Amino acid sequence: MEEGKPRRSSAVLWMLIPCGSIIIVLSVFVIILSTRPPVPPDIKILYCKEGWVGYNKNCYFFSEEKNNKSLAVERCKDMDGHLTSISSKEEFKFILRYKGPGNHWIGIEKVDFNGTWKLEDGSSYDNIVPIKGIGDCAYLSDRSIMSSFCFLPKKWICRIILL
């Protein structure tokens, strides 16, 4: 080695140590920010999941797949929801606007020969929008609520209530 010239390896080493330290610190920072703890089941839901649409403290999922009514109920349960009911004219208009084309199962069923309609939770349907048809299971058509045989395949709409 020649006299008076700085050593190249020590200069590189002094540059690598700070750069390496910065990379390690940034990596740890990214890992900390990107990992989230699981949400405990007793925590309230404050926002809609990806693929769901929010309206009036509810989240709605509009399916593209078709199932019979009982499978539609199960699919909603698998997503921690239930088939939607209709609670107001405004909700009815919102759902019609977002559901797209086709018929969609909702959570209203006829429970007796007198034409009494009940929601999935067992409460009475308030006939906010009259249900037309002769079937036992209600669905949304393009403009109204209709009824048909429960075994027929249709799209479906799930709802999760934000707490």
Curated annotation (Swiss-Prot):
| InterPro entries the record matches | C-type_lectin-like, C-type_lectin-like/link_sf, C-type_lectin/matrix_domain, CTDL_fold, NKR-like_CTLD
Organism of origin: Fowlpox virus (strain NVSL) (FPV)
Per UniProt, the keywords (alphabetical) are: Disulfide bond, Lectin
Question: In this UniProt entry, which cysteines form S-S bonds?
Answer: C76-C158, C137-C150
C-type lectin domain boundaries: 48-159
Protein name listed in UniProt: Putative C-type lectin protein FPV239
Upper classification of the source organism reads: Viruses, Varidnaviria, Bamfordvirae, Nucleocytoviricota, Pokkesviricetes
Query: What GO molecular functions are on record for this protein?
Result: carbohydrate binding
**Sorted alphabetically, which Pfam families does this protein's record hold?**
Lectin_C
